[in-house]
Amino acid sequence: MSIILGIDPGSRVTGYGVIRQNGRHLQYLGSGCIRTSEKDLPGRLKQIYAGVTEIITQFQPDAFAIEQVFMAKNADSALKLGQARGAAIVSAVNHDLPVYEYAARLIKQAVVGTGGADKAQVQHMVQHMLKLPAKPQADAADALGVAICHANTNKTLIALAGQATSAKRGRYR
């Protein structure tokens, strides 16, 4: 059983989602958005760091999963996104959490079944998969999608490790 914190980074709005994975079962623990109010980027990064630190303290996750930077058309936006990711990652590292990064297409594939899914499809499937009474906010749904992607990846790795162990045992008998 593990608790996974998923992060959808942004310099103005950073989504977060927390789930508990118990084998194949996923349980929703919480989600929301860290909304920055500072005008300057360093102030916003400080708010992201503080917000992620507060979430880590509250939920005590075992793993930290974050969306990778995509190549935006605007280089300035991509740099700011990278800095927002950095602020969140530093908080995780300061709490000795393992950090996992996933591409947006892989996250959408894990949640919706296609890497080209839009935000509404991700929201719908996150609501369905976690049995939520209402659709989560878009940024929170994306963050929950990151956590779900990590849980699915983690399950696959555990299954593969089990197969490798079984195969190894078979060879030595």
Swiss-Prot record:
GO terms for cellular component: cytoplasm; Holliday junction resolvase complex. Keywords: Cytoplasm, DNA damage, DNA recombination, DNA repair, DNA-binding, Endonuclease, Hydrolase, Magnesium, Metal-binding, Nuclease. Its cofactor is Mg(2+). It is an enzyme of class 3 (hydrolase). Its EC number is 3.1.21.10. It is found in: Cytoplasm. InterPro entries: RNaseH-like_sf (IPR012337), RNaseH_sf (IPR036397), X-over_junc_endoDNase_Mg_BS (IPR020563), X-over_junc_endoDNase_RuvC (IPR002176). It comes from the Bacteria. Pfam families: RuvC (PF02075). One of its GO terms (molecular function) is crossover junction DNA endonuclease activity. The active site is at residues 8, 67, 139. It catalyses: Endonucleolytic cleavage at a junction such as a reciprocal single-stranded crossover between two homologous DNA duplexes (Holliday junction). One of its GO terms (biological process) is DNA repair. Binds 2 Mg(2+) ion per subunit. The keyword Magnesium applies. SUPFAM superfamilies: Ribonuclease H-like (SSF53098). Mg(2+) 1 binds at residues 8, 139. The RuvA-RuvB-RuvC complex processes Holliday junction (HJ) DNA during genetic recombination and DNA repair. Endonuclease that resolves HJ intermediates. Cleaves cruciform DNA by making single-stranded nicks across the HJ at symmetrical positions within the homologous arms, yielding a 5'-phosphate and a 3'-hydroxyl group; requires a central core of homology in the junction. The consensus cleavage sequence is 5'-(A/T)TT(C/G)-3'. Cleavage occurs on the 3'-side of the TT dinucleotide at the point of strand exchange. Belongs to the RuvC family. Homodimer which binds Holliday junction (HJ) DNA. The HJ becomes 2-fold symmetrical on binding to RuvC with unstacked arms; it has a different conformation from HJ DNA in complex with RuvA. In the full resolvosome a probable DNA-RuvA(4)-RuvB(12)-RuvC(2) complex forms which resolves the HJ. This is Crossover junction endodeoxyribonuclease RuvC. It comes from Vibrio vulnificus (strain CMCP6).
